[in-house]
């Protein structure tokens, strides 16, 4: 009865807040958290077909974030007015055509407001919270329902980069010590080719004029930071355009920076007809430099196209964002050159991707052939930043900007950005898989992805795992349900409802922990049904999943060598990050 009373209390508080616009008391979040502990129910299938059931009354959203999202959709349905209806879990204002419901759902998923693959039970997904976020980001009245203003916003052409709330800038940037390079690939035929290039150059100057950056145009055959090209529908990066209208363009964050423009649009200059190339390009280059979308409607980084602006000027919001990353203008200016850059990328400390002038990010070779080149030395350090088994049972080891696919007789390698798409930083700290979702951790944020999604919502770790520190070292999820996060010599155990149960030393929680792991681990992964692998200093150790007992390998040793046993292609090529230097400019 006590639990029933708590449920009724919270439902009443939500009803009052929703209908009468009365703010919840300060104690409400803790009460709602307690309710989610009592009522959350989920049965997830892990990578090996095992299930971990718990009992309860309410079902969370598919990404398992609903306990932070406010009202449950079943409560919303009971409080709609006579001028509203509920269609497939979405509250719809009278006069808005029901066809907009599916458009809204697709939009919310595509741009990061709801988890991917949202074909779960309609009551599982809190569309009201997602709509409120969407309306806030679009700068329209926040009602939480599909009203006329929301339907109009859905039909407005926009940028294809997901909306990441509420953050303004990326944690990954270009260096200010040398120009950011750009080159031209395929261009639109809507304008004279020289005019296209002039509009692009003008778009770069927008950011050059107010920041500590400079830009250099280089031939398309050279190593380049930002490659500009036009294409239609499937244009080679795995993120297809949608024809005229809808998504106009998209760009990749540093250190992949490329900007792609939908050639199905009619690109124009200096006119209100068509789509203004200069303004869209300047917006996309904001992403290429590390800016996310802005909620300020007058800002260039507002996600929706607002038409041609004759006397365009950057908004103060845009200026503040770019200067927070790169400082103010030093007067270096944007230059154009037809010569190869004199600074070779491999001899600098610049945190960018490797040479990819003639490759496409979405195309990753995942098999090893006799003609495949030797792996880069940096990929052969023997140490991994993270190791993850994804929802398709593929195991990837991440090391700097590279990955190794380990679930093959002869492991293959490639760039992390090629395999996982844009929106995921390359400085990954840890990763694990739960059900259909793969989680990635970097600094104080987590990102998630499924097999059908390439975009990555960026969320503070403490929104989901309260009490978890930033910059974790490793993580794995037990087949029994708990998730173990590692930070220095400590391990944080969270239950299946993502509540912290215990913080203790690694040597205290597991049995017969090798002394080499007492001070911390580099990566952890559930390798198969029986064993968890722990990586540290070029070696890996194994522990039984159910008994949490470290055991020796058949040769009697407590560890196995990573290069000898896991990535033999690296024999003779091992090189630590610190000593990599500029040994091979092609890498």
Curated annotation (Swiss-Prot):
Entry remark concerning the domains of this protein: There are two distinct domains in this protein; the catalytic N-terminal, and the C-terminal which is involved in substrate specificity. The conserved cysteine present in the cysteine-switch motif binds the catalytic zinc ion, thus inhibiting the enzyme. The dissociation of the cysteine from the zinc ion upon the activation-peptide release activates the enzyme.
Catalysed reaction equations from the record: Hydrolysis of proteins of the fertilization envelope and dimethylcasein
Active site, renumbered: 284
Protein name listed in UniProt: Hatching enzyme
Gene Ontology annotations for the cellular component aspect, listed alphabetically: extracellular matrix
Protein EC: 3.4.24.12
CC cofactor: Zn(2+)
